[in-house]
Amino acid sequence: MKKHPLILCAGITSLLLSACNPVKVPEAILPVPEAKQVEWQKMETYAFVHFGLNTFNDREWGYGDSDPKTFNPAKLDCEQWVKTFVESGMKGVILTAKHHDGFCLWPTQLTEYCIRNTPYKNGQGDIVRELSDACKKYGIKFAVYLSPWDRHQANYGTPEYVD
């Protein structure tokens, strides 16, 4: 009588152990993302900040003809932006550092059409640096968008511009 439960347990154990054999992973049919692509997808939500001359000139698109002196975000607080992004669950920030109008939010030497020629911090401001520093402080990623299109460029709209 005691042999029945023992045989039953042995049978069940052998069935369970046979189910534990390694399963062959199927071959990938489509391209498999690289590890860095998977990490990018895990980032999920970013803030995309479009802030520049248009903000102060009531324009959706700039034509590269707005006076830089109209740009003066005297109460700008990049840390406040980043705190808000973090509280909203954002994993990073992308700043439009130069849009199609050609205006640069950092003091570049490559064009006069930049923050260096504004009243903001007496021409000493650098919003790219300020936002980057705030992102580091609060532990989120930072990136910039630079438009390759530059409507402020003198030869814009000519064949030379395209070359």
What is the predicted role of each segment?
Residues 1-23:
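Bacterial Sec-dependent N-terminal signal peptides
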Residues 21-163:
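Mature catalytic domains of secreted/periplasmic carbohydrate-active enzymes
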